[in-house]
Amino acid sequence: MRHRHGLRKLNRTSSHRQAMFRNMANALLRHEVIKTTLPKAKELRRVVEPMITLGKKPSLANRRLAFDRLRDREIVVKLFDELGPRYATRNGGYLRILKFGFRDGDNAPMALVELLDRPEAEVAEQEAVAA
């Protein structure tokens, strides 16, 4: 039986996995959309969603917990000042994982991971006005 086998190992050591998901979480929180393989995307959801939930309660202890996991001050500031208030009324489910075809070379299933409620329409309008 495959009960209680927690996470995907992804053919990596635990330190490599931890560093990879830290980097992927930072990239996702910075750019709000990333492209990766489907198994990594599903595992990344388990890392990022608790971080956003942490960002909804801005206390010093929560900031320190977030910094301990992300190790990037700029991202921690964005998490608590921008993303926490954005998702204040949403109870979980902050990410969308879209299947994105297959990668050339090894045919790995790819996925697009994005934060919900991104303010992309305003950015597109500002770029159109600037051009």
Curated annotation (Swiss-Prot):
This is Large ribosomal subunit protein bL17. Part of the 50S ribosomal subunit. Contacts protein L32. Keywords: Ribonucleoprotein, Ribosomal protein. Belongs to the bacterial ribosomal protein bL17 family. GO terms for cellular component: cytosolic large ribosomal subunit. PANTHER family: LARGE RIBOSOMAL SUBUNIT PROTEIN BL17M, RIBOSOMAL PROTEIN L17. GO terms for biological process: translation. It comes from Azoarcus sp. (strain BH72). Disulfide bonds: none annotated. The keyword Iron-sulfur does not apply. One of its GO terms (molecular function) is structural constituent of ribosome. Pfam families: Ribosomal_L17. HAMAP family: Ribosomal_bL17.
